[in-house]
Amino acid sequence: MRPPGDAMPCPVCRAAGTGRFLGIEDRNYWRCPTCEATFLDPAQRPGPVEELAHYRHHENDPDDPHYRRFLSKLSDPLLAALPPGCRGLDYGCGPGPALAAVLTEAGHEVQLYDPFFHPDRQALDQCYDFITCTETAEHFHHPAREFDRLGGMLKPGGMLGVMTCFQTDDARFADWHYRKDPTHVVFYRAATLAVIARQRHWSFESPAKDVALMRKPG
């Protein structure tokens, strides 16, 4: 664990000058003043065994209408922006890739990748018209590196759709259900994702709460 005042580069935007934000029980959180990300002290991130054990408790049935409705916050605006017959990647799809099923039913081809449940690294060597990242970015141990990777897999003009619960008031952070998930190690605001997009010269819009659509230049 880093001593108080020992700053580190932001893992989201790589800016210097992050500072300690809040200590809650045995977990210490840092804040970046540049992109407004909040992140868990890197020394306290869970290991892969702990992560997998937690993920196995997730019950995301691809046929569950309630789960599909939840995902529609991203799928609806993404589908409205895509031309017919695109090829995409569901990055961090988990054990029940419901979003991929929705997009496939809409006429698109969707590859799957998840480091635990669909670890097909060949999927990472291809380029796509769109990439979705739903309920995944909060698990990133190295967010800047991950967004660089995602951008590298997008074709010119390709779209990245991100869905993660945006942090709101700092006063609510300690009791926030999203923070209490032990595998959630980084928290974004809409402004955070706007910085991520701007650094890579992508366009940015947030068509719904907790959703961002970014487009790589054509």
What are these regions (language model features)?
Residues F147-P156:
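A short glycine-rich, Lys/Arg-flanked "PGG" loop and its adjoining helix->strand segment in the class I
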Residues E135-H139:
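A short His-aromatic
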Residues E109, M159, S203:
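Residue-level detector of anion-binding/catalytic polar loops
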Residues R189-W202:
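Low-complexity, intrinsically disordered Gly/Pro/Thr-rich segments
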Residues M1-F130, T134, F147, M163, ...:
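Conserved N-terminal segment of class I S-adenosyl-L-methionine
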Residues H141-R145:
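Short N-terminal helix/helix-N-cap motif within the alpha/beta-hydrolase-1
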Residues M163-V186, A191-T192:
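Short, glycine-/aromatic-enriched active-site segment of Class I SAM-dependent methyltransferases
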